[in-house]
Amino acid sequence: MRQVLQKDKRDVQLSKALSYLLRHTAVKEKLTIDSNGYTPLKELLSHNRLKTHKCTVDDIHRIVKENDKQRFHIKTLGADEEWICATQGHSIKSIQPSDEVLVPITEASQLPQELIHGTNLQSVIKIIESGAISPMSRNHVHLSPGMLHAKGVISGMRSSSNVYIFIDCHSPLFFQTLKMFRSLNNVYLSSSIPVELIQKVVVKGNLKDEEKLDTLRRILHERNIPLEKI
């Protein structure tokens, strides 16, 4: 049992190291990375962040296969040259993925029934007040095709999210305003989303900060955006 726990802990550490390098710092760390976000696996394994954990090719294969959010993808070039990428979440500006890794969404028939941005109480207030859901330091806004743990929903929001912003996929403004893509792990990625495309805001659980809740109620009411609790 103890060995299993240690293995799980090590896999979490390796997954975090992979995310850090592939999403954010590959260029800074002078790793080869192409415009789709792929890095040679052998080169990645030589980096100190992975060498510290004595990471092997088998470790990487296991993490890619078993990661519950399918954060990583491996492709093979030639006979045995493997390259790995993070499926989304990048802040590296030189990454401009082709439709090999990001499928352009250009018509309503390509959209799921729901598109939801998961966040928290403090952040949703900032979003409404600023007028848009912004990618912040990342390249895209992340959207999930449903609530956490719903059928077919792998990723797209943090498990700690307790506020859900539903996007109006049927608005005439949707394709006029947004550039939308779908990632390899079925996360929908967008440019900045104006609040005019917010269909409703749903708060989950019993949030105790009544002052912030009152602020949220007020600013949503001012913009005619419904607020629901579940």
From Swiss-Prot:
Molecular function GO labels: tRNA 2'-phosphotransferase activity
Cellular component annotations (GO), alphabetically ordered: cytoplasm; nucleus
Record's keyword terms, sorted: NAD, Transferase, tRNA processing
EC numbers for this chain: 2.7.1.160
Pfam families to which the protein is assigned, alphabetical: PTS_2-RNA
SUPFAM superfamilies: ADP-ribosylation
Top-level taxonomic group: Eukaryota
Group of enzyme by EC: transferase
Keyword tRNA processing: yes
GO BP terms: tRNA splicing, via endonucleolytic cleavage and ligation
Reaction equations catalysed: 2'-phospho-[ligated tRNA] + NAD(+) = mature tRNA + ADP-alpha-D-ribose 1'',2''-cyclic phosphate + nicotinamide
Remaining remarks: Present with 672 molecules/cell in log phase SD medium.
Protein function: Catalyzes the last step of tRNA splicing, the transfer of the splice junction 2'-phosphate from ligated tRNA to NAD to produce ADP-ribose 1''-2'' cyclic phosphate.
Stated family: Belongs to the KptA/TPT1 family.
Name of the protein described by the UniProt record: tRNA 2'-phosphotransferase
Source organism of the structure: Saccharomyces cerevisiae (strain ATCC 204508 / S288c) (Baker's yeast)
